[in-house]
């Protein structure tokens, strides 16, 4: 089994698109972006025959990536709702993306033994962790970090922050 694919969720956002650009230049991996384009942009897509863009939601990641699952080396998960102020205004969208969608990504990685690289935030790590309950965004990110630690303990899930 050749694991020659890297997945980037949120691949048309600022961080994801810059990571894809870097990976395309510095590695030989095939790269697949999964993005719902809620804050990402088609303008950030890179024209390269090793890069594929899939429009979709992380809540359906198992369905979207099922055909690639045996060839995926790692998943960089940047495809979350990432606005502190807006997480109060769009609470349901924040929970759907950061809790439900992210848990689907975690489960897909766990089930298929794929290493996860998860994007943390100063909203949960800053101020010695005391700010983790200040917004729905920070709360969901803090709970996801806690869940990852437990998935590692319980199931030896491989991840990096």
Task: Report residues per predicted region.
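N-terminal Rossmann-like NAD(P)+-binding domain of SDR-like oxidoreductases, especially those catalyzing
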Residues: 1-161
């Amino acid at each position: 089994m050749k694991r020659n694919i890297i997945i980037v969720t949120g691949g048309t956002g600022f961080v994801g698109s810059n990571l894809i650009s870097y990976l395309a230049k510095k590695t030989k991996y095939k790269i697949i972006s999964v993005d719902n384009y809620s804050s990402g942009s088609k303008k950030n897509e890179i024209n390269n025959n090793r890069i594929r863009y899939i429009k979709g939601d992380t809540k359906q990641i198992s369905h979207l990536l099922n055909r690639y699952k045996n060839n995926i080396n790692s998943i960089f998960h940047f495809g979350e709702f990432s606005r502190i102020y807006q997480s109060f205004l769009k609470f349901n969208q924040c929970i759907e993306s950061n809790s439900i969608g992210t848990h689907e990504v975690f489960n897909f990685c766990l089930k298929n033994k794929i290493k996860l690289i998860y994007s943390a935030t100063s909203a949960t790590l800053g101020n010695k962790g005391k700010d983790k309950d200040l917004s729905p965004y920070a709360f969901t990110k803090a709970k996801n970090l806690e869940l990852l630690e437990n998935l590692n303990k319980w199931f030896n899930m491989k991840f990096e922050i």
